[in-house]
């Protein structure tokens, strides 16, 4: 195999794809800053329509619906990934669903002019559908066009897009930018611009060569794209690996969601995929951001929103750090380090929150714990669950696996958002003990069950799971440790 290079074509394609990740992050964070203003809009709109102000219960319910329906859309969208990528391809799917982003952005951006709360809620649902689809499309596309030796580093760019989106939403949400009573519809409707930008750029990006060869049997086209993306003429080994996978796929029928759980060679990787997604959402990261503003205020920070933005900057910085570490330390190691560090920090947060009224310095200890907690999240549990799913499966089951994993992520996100406020009300600072328990459980699971995928081709990983499943069927034993001991594929020299 020839020396692979990080070419401008590869960087361009990955950058354009991560606009979808940015959209997910932006629309996740954008609703928080203008909460008070949007509640006033809902109150005024319903008062004008009904000639009487709505009850506090109705007002709170409509606001909660505006926030939560985004996750409902995400669940539906993420579960629909396979319907698009198998029919239209990876690139074309990203292009088509930008129609949803424009539609959702228009609904949200025009809801104030139309004096329609329904448009706001419908817009959040549609943009949730779009973001749910993006959480499947982007990691899949990046994983399939990246050289094996850099697949993890480029996969981390998906998470970088998400955290940059959240940070931009926090900054744009400041009152003197777009978070004012007059401009908040533009804040929500801004999502149209990245959609237009991505739609204009995607036609200049190649389709996934794996999709072209394995799904469409276009070997010559796939070969030319690989040569252009990787900057080498000798891609024969990669083409042969795809052809072998294509031959295996031709002997199998299309994999359904139920078959992921029924077939022994798919069962373990799909369980690993789901648990890793749960480890992200049940880590307590959203709870920490929920608490952060109040904690910063208690510590004497005059404008806690700026401290929250500071946490967002830490978020971004350590995602970049993870980008450089993931191909050196490996996915499994970084995920365990992240989970272990977060467990320690969540314990420290519980102690400092309980003692902050008695000891002045404890508020600052808690702030430090929050920032380090966020840093550990972005080292492992933030980026790794998104792209490792694409690594654990071959071309046939990959779309169904991405759909199941994405849906489990969105569902757990929805449940945490639904249940956390009540848990925080009844448990107070002790609520973080729950997350500590989850983190320790996920750490143990990762140690015993999750294989290292660094430096392995998709074919290597798939064959390892198949061998493990056959061995388990014969002996009744679990073969995970054998998989963890497999040597990575011979690494290709990669020039930047």
Swiss-Prot record:
Q: List the ranges whose topology is Cytoplasmic.
A: 1-10, 86-90, 143-153, 205-269, 326-331, 390-399, 451-496
Please describe the organ and tissue distribution of this protein's expression.
Highly expressed in brain. Expressed in many tissues.
Q: Where are the residues of the annotated region Important for selectivity against fructose? A: 277-279
One Pfam match, given by its short name, reads Sugar_tr
Q: Where does D-glucose bind?
A: 159, 280-281, 286, 315, 378, 386
- Notes on the domains: Transport is mediated via a series of conformation changes, switching between a conformation where the substrate-binding cavity is accessible from the outside, and a another conformation where it is accessible from the cytoplasm.
Question: What is the name of the protein in this document?
Answer: Solute carrier family 2, facilitated glucose transporter member 3
Whose protein is this, by species? Homo sapiens
């Amino acid at each position: 195999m020839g020396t692979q290079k990080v070419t401008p074509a590869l960087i361009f394609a990955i950058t354009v794809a991560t606009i979808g990740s940015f959209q997910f992050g932006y629309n996740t964070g954008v609703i928080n800053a203008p909460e008070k203003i949007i509640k006033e809009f809902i109150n005024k709109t319903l008062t004008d329509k009904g000639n009487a102000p709505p009850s506090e219960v109705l007002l709170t319910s409509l606001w909660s619906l505006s926030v939560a329906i985004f996750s409902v859309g995400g669940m539906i969208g993420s579960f629909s990934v396979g319907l698009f990528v198998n029919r239209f391809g990876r690139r074309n799917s990203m292009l088509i669903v930008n129609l949803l982003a424009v539609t959702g952005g228009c609904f949200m951006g025009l809801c104030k002019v139309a004096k329609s709360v329904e448009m706001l809620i419908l817009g959040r649902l549609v943009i949730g559908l779009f973001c749910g689809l993006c959480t499947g499309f982007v990691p899949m596309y990046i994983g399939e066009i990246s050289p094996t030796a850099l697949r993890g580093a480029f996969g981390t760019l998906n998470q970088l897009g998400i955290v940059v989106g959240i940070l931009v939403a926090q900054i744009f949400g400041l009152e003197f930018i777009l978070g004012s009573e007059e401009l908040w519809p533009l804040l929500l409707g801004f999502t149209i611009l990245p959609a237009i930008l991505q739609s204009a750029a995607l036609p200049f990006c190649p389709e996934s060569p794996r999709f072209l060869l394995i799904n469409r049997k276009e070997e010559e086209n796939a070969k030319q794209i690989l040569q252009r993306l990787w900057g080498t003429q000798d891609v024969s080994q990669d083409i042969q690996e795809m052809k072998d996978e294509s031959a295996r796929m031709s002997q199998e029928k299309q994999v359904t969601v139920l078959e992921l759980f029924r077939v022994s060679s798919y069962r373990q990787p799909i369980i690993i995929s789901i648990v890793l997604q749960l480890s992200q959402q049940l880590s307590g990261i959203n709870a920490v951001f929920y608490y952060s503003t109040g904690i910063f205020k208690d510590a004497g920070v005059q404008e806690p929103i700026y401290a929250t933005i500071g946490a967002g900057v830490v978020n971004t910085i350590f995602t970049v750090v993870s980008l450089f570490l993931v191909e050196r330390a490996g996915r499994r190691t970084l995920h365990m380090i992240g989970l272990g560090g977060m467990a320690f920090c969540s314990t420290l947060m519980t102690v400092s929150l309980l003692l902050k009224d008695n000891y002045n310095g404890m508020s600052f200890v808690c702030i430090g714990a929050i920032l380090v907690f966020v840093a550990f999240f972005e080292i492992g549990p933030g980026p790794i669950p998104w792209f490792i799913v694409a690594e654990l499966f071959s071309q046939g089951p990959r779309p169904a696996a991405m759909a199941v994993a994405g849906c489990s992520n969105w569902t757990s996100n929805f449940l945490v958002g639904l249940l956390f406020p009540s848990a925080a009300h009844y448990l107070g600072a002790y609520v973080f003990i729950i997350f500590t328990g989850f983190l320790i459980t996920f750490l143990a699971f990762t140690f015993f069950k999750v294989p290292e995928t660094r430096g392995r081709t998709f074919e290597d990983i798939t064959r390892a799971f198949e061998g493990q499943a056959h061995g388990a069927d014969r002996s009744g034993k679990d073969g995970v440790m054998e998989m963890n001991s497999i040597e990575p594929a011979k690494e290709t020299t990669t020039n930047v």
